[in-house]
Amino acid sequence: YLKGCWTKSYPPKPCFSR
């Protein structure tokens, strides 16, 4: 499930949460 949040890495990647 893709949450509407982003990692603080570069390039920014979508973070996944179950």
Curated annotation (Swiss-Prot):
Arginine amide modification, residue list: 18
Disulfide bond residue pairs: 5-15
Keyword Cytoplasm belongs to the record: no
Location in or out of the cell: Secreted
Keywords in alphabetical order: Amidation, Cleavage on pair of basic residues, Disulfide bond, Inflammatory response, Mast cell degranulation, Secreted
GO cellular component: extracellular region
Secreted is among the record's keywords: yes
Transmembrane segment boundaries: none
GO biological process: inflammatory response; mast cell degranulation; positive regulation of inflammatory response
Principal subcellular localisation of the protein: secreted
Top-rank taxon: Eukaryota
Tissues in which the protein is found: Expressed by the skin glands.
Family according to the record: Belongs to the frog skin active peptide (FSAP) family. Brevinin subfamily.
Main function: Mast cell degranulating peptide. Inhibits granulopoiesis in human bone marrow in vitro. Causes histamine release from rat peritoneal mast cells in vitro. Does not induce apoptosis of human neutrophils in vitro.
Protein name as catalogued: Peptide tyrosine arginine
